[in-house]
Every structure is written in C-alpha cells, then in structure tokens.
A protein has these predicted regions:
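Class I SAM-dependent methyltransferase SAM/SAH-binding core
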Residues: 70, 76-125
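A short acidic, Gly/Pro-enriched loop at the edge of an enzyme's catalytic core
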Residues: 124-136
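Conserved class I S-adenosyl-L-methionine
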Residues: 1-64, 167-190
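Short alpha-helix
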Residues: 197-218
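A C-terminal cap/extension of S-adenosyl-L-methionine-dependent methyltransferases
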Residues: 185-186, 220-274
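A short SAM/SAH-binding and catalytic strip from SAM-dependent methyltransferases
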Residues: 136-148
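A short glycine-rich, Lys/Arg-flanked "PGG" loop and its adjoining helix->strand segment in the class I
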Residues: 150-162
Length: 274
C-alpha cells in the first residue's frame, strides 16, 4: 500500500491527538522520569529499554548546556524536551503539527518553553534551518520514515555542523527473517504509517552515511530478544520478563562468540561525527 505525505501526516495527527488532553503531570520529562519509564514494565519505552538506555547514555555522555539540538521526527517530544531540561536549545521537527503542539506543551509543562521551538514539515525541505545550525541531531525510529522523501538525507546533513554529532535509534534491516515478519505485519495492519516504512536502515544505508561522516559507530542489539514483539503489552508478567532475560543472555553470549552476527540483530544505535 503506497502512502502520500498527506496520508502519513493525517495518520500521525490522529495518533498523537490523544496526547493533547493529558495532564501536565503526564508530560513531565527529565532524566529521572526517563530512567523510571525505561525500567517500568508498563511504560511505553520498556519494550525498547535496551536501545533507549543506550541512547540516553550517549546523549548525556557530553554536556548539553548551550548545545543546539534537533529532535528529528520528534513524535510527542520526549527526547527534545529531555535535552532542554539538561540545558540544550532544542528544536522539535515532525511531519505532524499535532506532534509539535504536544511537544511544545510538554516543554511548557517542564519549564523549558524558552529553550524549545517546533517546526512541522516533511524532511525533504528543512529550509526553516540554516546550514550547520545544529550541534547534535537525534532521530528516534525516524530515519526509516524520512529516507523515502527526496533530498531528506542531504537536508539532514546540511543542517548538522561540521564536527556535529548524529545519533540514530533505529530498526535494523539486515535480517531477512525479521524483515519478512515486519512486512507481513504491515500488510495485515493496513495502516498507512506501516506502509510508509519501506526503507529499513541496513548496511546499504549505513554505507551511504559513512560517506558523509568522519566517524560512524554501530551498536547492534536484540537478536533472539526481538521475540519481545510477541510479548508486547505483557511485560508486567514475571514469566515474560524471565523469558526476556534468558533471551537477552543468549544474545550477549552469542554476540560475544560471533560478533559478525550483530548485523542480523533487530535494532541498532548509530553514533556518527560529521
């Protein structure tokens, strides 16, 4: 099922609209709340806790005070506002105007409205930003949506300053079994957002990025542990968490013995320096 920019925007506007009506308390976002959500089985981030824990460590590995950062494909703005609470000047970018509205409200709820601005547009035209405007660009599960847009990668590279840092938290697309299951799920779901995810970040895309960065580090994770998708919304079960612990241990051991199998993992953290 093909998808247009308008269809994708409409889908996400609808998906994010529920956040327009939550309380300010529900929008509290800082380092402590993020750590709590990552370790709370009922939390939205728990399924990807390994990936997002690595993201959090990377984002906080250097002082953010005074840094100019872009939350690229920000969704409802958790990461951009988090960086603002650490002292960054944050810009939220998303195709969905509703997402930007929620993100700016989140910024106000956390007392950092003066450090956060929003821009609603598709990634093929970032003319709202100047060349080399950002010290850091972070994209959480966003690049596989935007690469289908003409000029999206060139625009991302343009707005990141020389020496700037790109951090990507992404689905990893080298495993034919996982890719087949993903595509089956997309066809069954009949949802335009899933149909729009037709470029999954894999070795080809990473090689393309390497041509533009002086350094690019890739940390794959979750091979057997991608079975977590089967247990979605059931992580409060002790038996499920025990099973996931066993799968995580299997992954650690196998990837120690055969690091080359990392390319078949289901998720990846990419850190690059321009």
């Amino acid at each position: 099922m093909s998808i247009t920019t308008a269809q994708e925007q409409q889908f996400y506007d609808s998906a994010y609209a529920v956040h327009l009506h939550v309380s300010d308390d529900a929008l509290r976002t800082n380092r402590e709340s993020m750590l709590r959500d990552l370790n709370q089985p009922s939390g939205a981030f728990y399924e990807r806790r390994k990936l997002y824990s690595a993201v959090l460590a990377e984002l906080l590995s250097q002082p953010l005070t005074g840094q100019v950062v872009l939350d690229y494909g920000c969704g409802v703005g958790e990461w951009g506002v988090l960086m603002a609470t650490e002292g960054a000047q944050a810009t939220l970018l998303d195709l969905s105007p509703v997402a930007i509205e929620v993100g700016l409200r989140r910024a106000a709820a956390n007392g950092v409205a003066h450090l956060v601005r929003g821009c609603a547009r598709d990634a093929s035209d970032l003319s709202c930003f100047s060349d080399g405007e950002f010290d850091l660009v972070y994209a959480s599960a966003a690049l596989h949506h935007t690469l289908k847009y003409p000029n999206a990668l060139a625009e991302l590279l343009r707005v990141l300053r020389p020496g700037g840092r790109l951090v990507l938290a992404e689905t990893y697309g080298n495993n034919p079994v996982l890719n087949g299951l993903r595509r089956l799920r997309w066809r069954l779901s009949r949802q335009p957002d899933d149909a729009g995810e037709d470029i999954i970040l894999g070795d080809r895309e990473l090689d393309m990025l390497r041509n533009h960065f002086s350094r690019l580090d890739v940390t794959p994770m979750n091979l057997f542990a991608m079975a977590k998708r089967v247990f979605r919304a059931r992580f409060e079960s002790g038996a499920v968490r025990t099973t996931m612990g066993v799968l995580d241990a299997m992954d650690r051991r196998l990837l120690q013995l055969a690091p080359s199998l990392g390319r078949y993992c289901g998720e990846v953290l990419v850190v690059a320096e321009k």
